[in-house]
């Protein structure tokens, strides 16, 4: 091994020292030293660049490798001292010449900064006169290409709150033969293991041994006149020369380019004099010169000379760089902003946000808390936390690491959110889904686009949906498992996780599965839903509305446009506005919808065929593309009333649809046998979404099934045509009560497939993402999480499934499905069913809506449905909900299979969309909605009109005629085809167009295309569709887009909302145009990324091969695209987002808000970013904060994000949000003295047995995070000597303290905020009720409650804590502790806490922020967050009182439009100590954990104090 000497030079500038809150006056000094691992032979030389500025108390000095800053004196609070000490550290090392670059990037360069202090006499000569009081170690991550140019504020510990700002520049400056000897550590043996470390200097090698290798020896030639050089030595010399020259030139190029960039961005910076060097040409020239030399001595000298010349050039450039930029204020400001942005972005990882309807705040939500713990466990079981890339300058004590970063969950309660898509998460089913999608993926890859081929799935007779899994589901689960095992390890992990879940949670998990394809606990959050419904959902039991079938009244309420509209409030108000428009468009649909339809929708419309089980594989032939066989397992509820309980269908009602497809030819020329058992009666309304489509022609409302022939343009659909007999749909809709099983033989041609009328029902069945049509009930109702999950999984887990079921379902079912998908989590059976749908389509609505109501709302508002012919405007539909699913965001593509009920989502989409086939896909829709009796002309115009009024002008104008569809690109067509598949429902092509707007071809989709696309996709037959499909539009249409990219899915789902919301900046047409292009990319990405989850969703790279490409072209194109994406995932923002977003970042909320997002923005914006932000602007920083990390770290992190995506976690992560709470670096602005607005007074109140310094860190991080703001803190100390008194006494003290503080300092108060810890929160609330404080009520701004026992300690689960508090109460005779237990009066309604809850207070605040932790056993979690707990529900005595207190506290808050309620759950990374065990560590972590507080405030909470 040949070693070379390298020198890396570091310039360390100590800019300023800030006294944040030092306790002692005296002399302070910063000492800096550089260390690298002892295993690398090295020497460190330190020096001061030049003395600048005042010497202060004493000047800076150098002591060997230690540099001491100026010594300065601190006398005053908030004092700033300008140091401007520039230290130069030259690190000389011996490196292996074969691994120079790798070694330099892996070395840990450790910069140690120590704070030294003395309050006595000080002599500069005596280093020991100053004592070390605090220190920080910075790990500098150096790169040869980029060097290191960074700025950081280094804060010392809690007891010495001070900050020193440090700027670091580093570059390689020399690389040559070893010129000095280096100490080498002597290996220790067991004999001298206790001896002090020893080292010996290494020998200095000769130049020849370095150039030619250590084994080189001179050999004379035969003539004795020259030396011979063996070929191996000569090759070594050439390689040595090339490697070192290339490395030096690389460092030169990096430093030169950075220098140029700095001089361009900072005009005041000195310009660069050196001419630019053509690095590659120079390297080639040097190598050619060396190869011309024959004499070994001359060769070695020439190589040495070349290296010396390059080193001199590099040193000259480095010297000029330092001269120009050292202590340059503008550059320091620029670097400080960069570091702050990266740091906040890094903190935003693992910070989750969930958005709920406002009324959900009063619902029983303990399942949410439990799901938070499960999510934490699942996240920690992945490599996400351990692979989090470090910052360029890393300090684990300040920036956090695997062992210290908390995971935070935020629950928002917004008027703009109608459906609760962020339901509790149970990992099992979501894992199953991912497995299923993997399975599908493999199969689709094998056979083509269809879905996964799985064993026949048979639906077990109706069983308690929540209690049993059908055998078919089990089989599906097994098959999925097998496939999943073949899939990514991450998915396997997920599966294991799911297996560990308890069966009883299965229902909940299934229901959850809609939004993010994460299984959501059956929890509905709809304003219309009664609290009992919420509770039932939470408990996993169907709400009464579910059991009874959706109540028409409820349905209407649920479909209330406002309710339905799930505004993307998650992200931004703008997205909300877009959603609002959407809701307005949708409202007419809801009005038309019948209760039954709503029910179906709630059930997810998957249960359309009550007992339809499709086993075997279905593939719609695509001329060009192979379609993998798919098995579909469909279970439909026996009746709309039973929708919630898909499995409730009678056992005799089981129907099996067996479709055998030729592996390559799809089903060309083959026959499929459809076996239909007796159908339970289904209410016509159930099947009909048509009522939802006001614009559609009314069909006879009789029960007779009517068929609508809808040609789906091959654009999206492929040439293949699929005809589902209207009768079959109608029968399904009408719930054919056929006791006997019937067999229908259907010839499947490449062009079309017709299914008997009796099978119509099956069309409405939902399709799982995995490509398996799963019984709606089977997934949702099945207790077996694995089965349900797998069924849901499908290729495009949640997101795709959500979209797809909506499209595939009959109109009513679709509507319900879309609605139901939202509410599936809420409704137990229905929600379960919907969950399966959602898993398929990642039903966003499921997650968001309350069980039944949510389902209804989401589906209807999104699209207008006319009879069974309803066309869903995907855009109009609650795609944002799908967005919420994020991962599967749109499986619709997959689902667009021609077969109405039996095809996989993916399979359907693929087949129907076979672009290769020019023939439009023909779908026969039965009037499944006999009740509505409205025949929706597939002209999506009606439903399109509502959603796309503005931009859709083209599509809207079109009639049901297929013409309108033609304009649609393949994407649109795909949308239509899913509709076809659904049988009665067609997705609005317009929506699809909206999403795909430009289609991959880039041509804007016409609204009419969109409109007609749903039913009549045939319009532009194949040409446009083919292009679009190739472009991935088809997938987009089906939602594969969203599947691939959560943000994409969101955008798509939201698209129609966006279009309907045209409210968005652009008309739909504009959006379509922009979105079309991006959608093309997105579609491809999505497909590639796994949005088409069946095929490639499992791919860690996030790319998914599209299996539903029309013909082979589409498949090939998609695969190519996916390959490109995978290969370019690091460079492509879209791809990366897909990867990043996939798990962690796929935020349902973002998706909801996404409606405002434009598809075009998607291509520009990271998938992650798009999702979370309902904003349409691009934002790259969500993924860019780690872009300068080493590629292996970036790759590992993206892989971990993919793992996280597989978990289908609900909500979104703040890392995907473009704008975070903090944007201004610490100390970046001076306080504005002349503000006329007055000061913002923040009163901090400590807890039991606390003192005024308890909230010192909270104060610090708010002050640092709001530079320039006029903020004044009152750290309450009046009660610190006696916190055991009763609350009335402590209230009087605090009130006096506040009023006196304002008067003494003559403050002009513009805002008053309160921050309380523990007991202090009750004192604050009590102050608000006092007459003397009435004057200040109008100035109240934010109430931040940190672990406050607002409901007392009545239901504390810790016996140890209860015993301790009881003892303390008796010992101290504490009135406050007695009042906390609600035992201070014999009548519970006369206790202090109950009376306090009846008094006005909280609703006066603009923000009510409740922070709690499940790890905190001092204060019950539900008491800190003011929510119902399970124990209180069971307590017949005090439980009612507890519930009344919650309503008394929150009802005024919820009714006040100007009051924002937010709850947080903090999962701290706590060590295994006694404090952690008894729950004390978490209780005080909200006060003394720097990393938690900084993460909490920088990412989210600072906005409450701005």
UniProtKB/Swiss-Prot annotation:
It comes from the Eukaryota. InterPro entries: AB_hydrolase_fold, DUF3657, DUF676_lipase-like, Lipase-like. Residues 536-596, 629-662, 935-964 are annotated as: Disordered. Gene3D superfamilies: alpha/beta hydrolase. Residues 564-580, 629-654, 950-964 have a biased composition (Polar residues). It holds the Pfam family DUF676. Belongs to the FAM135 family. This is Protein FAM135A. It comes from Mus musculus.
């Amino acid at each position: 091994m040949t070693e070379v000497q390298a020198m890396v030079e570091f310039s360390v500038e100590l800019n300023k020292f800030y006294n944040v809150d030092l306790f002692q006056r005296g002399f302070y000094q910063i000492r800096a030293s550089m260390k690298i691992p002892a295993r690398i032979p090295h020497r460190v030389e330190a020096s001061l660049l030049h003395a600048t500025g005042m010497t202060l108390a004493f000047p800076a000095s150098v002591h060997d490798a230690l540099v001491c800053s100026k010594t300065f004196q601190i006398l005053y609070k908030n004092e700033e001292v300008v140091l401007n000490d520039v230290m130069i550290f030259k690190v000389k090392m011996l490196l292996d010449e074969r691994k120079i670059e790798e070694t330099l990037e892996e070395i840990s360069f450790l910069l140690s900064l120590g704070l030294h202090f003395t309050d006595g006499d000080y002599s500069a000569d005596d280093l020991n006169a100053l004592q070390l009081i605090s220190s920080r170690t910075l790990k500098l991550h150096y790169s040869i290409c980029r060097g290191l140019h960074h700025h950081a504020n280094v804060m010392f510990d809690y007891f010495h709150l001070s900050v020193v700002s440090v700027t670091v520049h580093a570059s390689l400056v020399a690389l040559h033969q070893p010129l000095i000897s280096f100490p080498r550590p002597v290996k220790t043996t067991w004999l001298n293991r206790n001896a002090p470390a020893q080292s010996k200097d290494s020998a200095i090698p000769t130049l020849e041994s370095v150039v030619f290798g250590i084994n080189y020896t001179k050999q004379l030639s035969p003539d004795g006149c020259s030396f011979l050089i063996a070929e191996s030595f000569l090759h070594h010399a050439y390689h040595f020369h090339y490697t070192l020259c290339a490395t030096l030139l690389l460092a030169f190029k990096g430093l030169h380019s950075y220098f140029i960039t700095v001089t361009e961005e900072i005009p005041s910076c000195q310009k660069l004099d050196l001419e630019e060097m053509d690095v590659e040409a120079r390297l080639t020239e040097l190598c050619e010169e060396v190869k011309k030399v024959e004499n070994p001595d001359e060769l070695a000298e020439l190589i040495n000379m070349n290296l010396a010349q390059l080193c001199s050039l590099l040193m000259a450039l480095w010297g000029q760089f330092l001269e120009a930029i050292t202590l340059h204020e503008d550059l320091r400001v620029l670097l400080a902003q960069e570091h702050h942005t990266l740091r906040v972005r890094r903190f935003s990882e693992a910070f989750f946000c969930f958005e709920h309807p406002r009324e959900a705040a009063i619902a029983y939500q303990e399942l949410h808390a439990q799901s938070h713990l499960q999510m934490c466990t699942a996240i920690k079981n992945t490599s996400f936390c351990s692979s989090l890339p470090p910052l360029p300058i890393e300090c684990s004590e300040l920036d956090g690491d695997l062992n210290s970063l908390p995971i935070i969950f935020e629950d928002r309660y917004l008027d703009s959110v109608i459906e609760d898509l962020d339901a509790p998460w149970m990992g099992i089913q979501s894992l199953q889904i991912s497995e299923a999608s993997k399975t599908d993926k493999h199969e689709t890859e094998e056979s083509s686009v269809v879905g996964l081929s799985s064993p026949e799935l048979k639906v077990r007779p109706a069983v308690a949906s929540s209690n049993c899994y059908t055998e078919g589901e089990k089989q599906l689960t097994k098959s999925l498992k097998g496939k999943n095992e073949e899939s990514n390890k991450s998915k396997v992990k997920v599966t294991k996780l799911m297996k560990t879940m308890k069966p009883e949670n299965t229902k909940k998990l299934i229901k959850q599965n809609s939004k993010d394809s994460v299984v959501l606990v059956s929890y509905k959050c709809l304003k219309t839903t009664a609290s009992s419904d919420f509770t039932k959902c939470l408990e996993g039991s169907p709400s009464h509305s579910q059991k009874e079938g959706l109540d028409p009244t409820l349905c209407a309420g649920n479909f209330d446009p406002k309710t339905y509209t799930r505004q993307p409030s998650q992200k931004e108000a703008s997205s909300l506005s877009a959603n609002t428009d959407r809701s307005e468009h949708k409202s007419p649909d809801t009005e038309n919808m019948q209760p039954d339809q709503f029910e179906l929708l709630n059930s997810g419309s998957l249960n359309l065929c009550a007992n339809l089980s499709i086993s075997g594989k279905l593939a719609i032939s695509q001329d060009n593309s192979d379609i993998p066989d798919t098995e579909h397992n469909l279970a439909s509820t026996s009746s709309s009333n039973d929708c919630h309980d898909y499995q409730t269908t009678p056992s005799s009602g089981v129907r099996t649809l067996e479709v055998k497809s030729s592996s390559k030819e799809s089903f060309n020329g083959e026959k499929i046998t459809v076996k239909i058992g007796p159908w339970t009666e289904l209410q016509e309304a159930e099947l009909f979404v048509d009522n939802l489509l006001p614009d559609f022609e009314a069909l006879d409302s009789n029960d007779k099934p009517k068929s609508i022939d809808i040609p789906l343009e091959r654009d999206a659909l492929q040439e293949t045509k699929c005809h589902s007999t209207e009768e079959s749909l109608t029968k399904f809709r009408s719930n054919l009560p056929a006791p006997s099983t019937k067999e229908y033989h259907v010839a499947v041609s490449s062009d079309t497939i017709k299914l008997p009328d009796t099978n119509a029902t099956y069309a409405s069945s939902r399709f799982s993402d995995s490509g398996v049509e799963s019984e709606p009930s089977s997934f949702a109702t099945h207790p077996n999480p694995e089965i349900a999950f797998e069924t849901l999984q499908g290729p495009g887990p949640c997101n795709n499934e959500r979209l797809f079921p909506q499209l595939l379902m009959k109109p009513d079912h679709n509507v319900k499905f879309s609605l139901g998908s939202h509410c599936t989590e809420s409704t137990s059976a229905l929600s379960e069913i919907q969950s399966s749908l959602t898993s398929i389509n990642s039903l966003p609505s499921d997650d968001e809506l309350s069980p039944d109501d949510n389902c209804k709302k989401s589906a209807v508002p999104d699209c207008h449905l006319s009879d069974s012919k309803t066309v869903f405007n995907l855009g109009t539909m609650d795609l944002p909900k799908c967005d919420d699913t994020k991962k599967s965001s749109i499986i619709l593509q997959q689902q667009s299979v021609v077969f109405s009920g039996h095809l996989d989502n993916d399979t359907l989409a693929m087949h129907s969309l076979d672009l290769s086939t020019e023939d439009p896909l023909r779908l026969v829709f039965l009037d499944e909605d006999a009740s509505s009796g409205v025949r929706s002309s597939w002209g999506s115009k009606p439903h399109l009109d509502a959603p796309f009024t503005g931009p859709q002008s083209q599509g809207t104008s079109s009639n049901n005629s297929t013409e309108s569809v033609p304009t649609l690109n393949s994407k649109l067509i795909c949308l239509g085809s899913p509709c076809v598949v659904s049988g009665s429902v067609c997705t609005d092509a317009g929506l699809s167009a909206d999403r795909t707007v430009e289609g991959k071809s880039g041509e804007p989709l016409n609204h009419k295309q969109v409109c007609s696309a749903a039913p009549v996709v045939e319009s532009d037959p194949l040409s446009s569709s083919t292009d679009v499909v190739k472009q991935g539009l088809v997938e987009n249409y089906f939602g594969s887009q969203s599947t691939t990219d959560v943000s994409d899915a969101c955008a798509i789902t939201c698209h129609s909302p966006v279009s309907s919301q045209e409210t968005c900046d652009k008309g739909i047409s504009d959006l379509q145009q922009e979105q079309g292009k991006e959608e093309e990319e997105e579609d491809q990405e999505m497909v590639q990324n796994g949005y088409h989850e069946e095929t490639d969703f499992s791919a860690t790279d996030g790319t998914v091969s599209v299996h539903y490409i029309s013909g082979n072209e589409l498949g090939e194109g998609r695969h190519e695209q996916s390959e490109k994406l995978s290969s370019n995932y690091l460079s492509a923002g879209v791809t990366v987002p897909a990867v990043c977003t996939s798990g962690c970042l796929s935020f349902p909320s973002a998706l909801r808000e996404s409606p405002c997002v434009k598809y075009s923005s998607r291509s520009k914006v990271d998938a992650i970013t798009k999702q979370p932000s309902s904003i349409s602007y691009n934002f790259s920083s969500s993924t860019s904060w780690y872009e300068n990390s080493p590629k292996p770290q970036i790759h590992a992190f993206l892989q971990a994000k993919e793992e996280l995506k597989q978990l289908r976690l609900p909500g979104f992560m703040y890392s995907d949000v473009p704008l975070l709470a903090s944007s201004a670096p610490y100390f970046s602005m001076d306080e504005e003295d002349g503000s006329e607005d007055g000061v913002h007074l923040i009163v901090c109140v400590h807890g039991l047995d606390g003192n005024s310094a308890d909230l010192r860190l909270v104060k610090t991080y708010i002050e640092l995070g709001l530079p320039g703001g006029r903020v004044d803190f009152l750290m309450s100390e009046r009660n610190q000597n006696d916190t055991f008194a009763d609350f009335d006494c402590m209230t009087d003290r605090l009130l006096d303290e506040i009023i006196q503080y304002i008067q003494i300092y003559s403050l002009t108060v513009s805002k008053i905020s309160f921050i309380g810890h523990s007991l202090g929160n009750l004192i604050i609330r009590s102050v608000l009720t006092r007459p003397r404080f009435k004057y200040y009520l109008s100035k109240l701004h934010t109430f931040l409650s940190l672990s406050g026992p607002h409901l007392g300690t009545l239901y504390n689960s810790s016996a140890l804590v209860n015993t301790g508090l009881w003892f303390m109460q008796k010992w101290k005779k504490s009135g406050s502790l007695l009042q906390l237990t609600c035992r201070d009066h014999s009548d519970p309604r006369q206790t202090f806490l109950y009376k306090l809850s009846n008094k006005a207070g909280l609703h006066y605040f603009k923000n009510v922020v409740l922070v709690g932790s499940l790890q905190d056993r001092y204060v019950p979690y539900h008491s800190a967050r003011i929510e119902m707990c399970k124990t209180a529900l069971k307590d017949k005595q005090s439980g009612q009182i507890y519930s009344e207190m919650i309503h008394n506290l929150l009802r005024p808050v919820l009714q006040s439009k100007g009051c924002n309620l937010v709850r947080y759950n903090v999962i701290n990374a706590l060590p295994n100590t006694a404090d952690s065990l008894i729950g004390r560590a978490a209780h005080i972590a909200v006060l003394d954990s720097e990393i938690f507080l900084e993460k909490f405030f920088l990412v989210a909470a600072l906005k409450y104090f701005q």
